[in-house]
UniProtKB/Swiss-Prot annotation:
Motif JAMM motif positions after renumbering to this chain: 174-187
Pfam families, alphabetized: RadC, UPF0758_N
The keyword Transmembrane belongs to this UniProt entry's keyword annotation: no
Annotated keywords: Hydrolase, Metal-binding, Metalloprotease, Protease, Zinc
Top-level taxon of the source organism: Bacteria
InterPro entries: MPN, RadC_JAB, RuvA_2-like, UPF0758, UPF0758_CS, UPF0758_N
Organism whose genome encodes this protein: Streptococcus pneumoniae serotype 4 (strain ATCC BAA-334 / TIGR4)
Family annotation (SUPFAM superfamilies): RuvA domain 2-like
Gene Ontology BP terms: proteolysis
Residue ranges of domain MPN in the record: 103-225
Name this protein carries in UniProt: UPF0758 protein SP_1088
Molecular function GO labels: metal ion binding; metallopeptidase activity
Signal peptide region: none
């Protein structure tokens, strides 16, 4: 009896999706489809609702580790891995959509986008965004991921991708895992070096952003270095 109910647990939302479209489904139903089956103690709908009840918002699901997912009743290692894979794929799709020929209108707009991408990272990430003459992003490159004490990559590496993608300008973005966005002396030094190197190559350094989960610092807005 149990095996039959397990197999049919998520059948109804699947049928609804096929008939009414994915937009018609609730978060619980979508999660039930991904989880597929319940347990002897709880249906897949109950498990899906328990997962959602543990979140203050859907974005919290993206932040959960494998261990945290497995700690939820009804989710084993395989389901936790499948959920993480689904979440990451959705994140990459969203990233590609927002990146593809996006026009940069303001530091604030870009900072908000990069806060979502880098704000919760536990290590420092340096990212370079390369733009064309219409200020549209044509390429995004992670220059390095590492300790906050490590020196940022040489300007040569940053400019390599600018030349490769025929960019006319670029924007640097890095996160401060501490949450404080005030620039360090090293941040100032790197900004000066990259700007000087860009000028030699006829490329414009539009901005250098420092982001955290809830705040940002713009060299263009706050300093005379750019």
């Amino acid at each position: 009896m149990y095996s039959i109910s397990f197999q049919e647990d998520s059948l109804l939302p699947r049928e609804r999706l096929a008939k009414e479209g994915v937009e018609a489904l609730s978060n619980q139903e979508l999660l039930a489809i991904l989880l597929r089956t319940g347990t002897r103690q709880a249906s897949v709908f109950e498990i899906a609702q328990k997962v959602l009840n543990n979140l203050s918002s859907l974005t919290d699901l993206k932040k959960m580790t494998l261990q945290e997912l497995q700690s939820l009743s009804g989710i084993g290692r395989v389901k936790a891995i499948e959920l993480q894979a689904m979440i990451e794929l959705g994140h990459r799709i969203h990233k590609h959509e927002t990146l593809e020929m996006e026009s940069i209108l303001s530091s604030q707009k870009l900072a908000k986008k990069m806060q979502q991408e880098l704000g919760d990272k536990k290590q420092e990430h340096l990212v370079a965004l390369y733009l064309n003459t219409q200020n549209q992003i044509i390429h995004q490159q992670t220059i390095f991921i590492g300790s906050v004490t490590r020196s940022i990559a040489e300007p040569r590496e940053i400019l390599h991708y600018a030349i490769k993608h025929m960019a006319t300008s670029l924007i640097l973005v890095h996160n401060h895992p501490s949450g404080a966005v005030a620039p360090s002396q090293n941040d100032d030094h790197v900004t000066k070096l990259v700007k000087e190197a860009c000028e030699l190559m006829g490329i414009v350094l539009l901005d250098h952003l420092i982001v955290s989960h809830s705040n940002y610092f713009s060299y263009r807005e706050k300093t005379d270095l750019i």
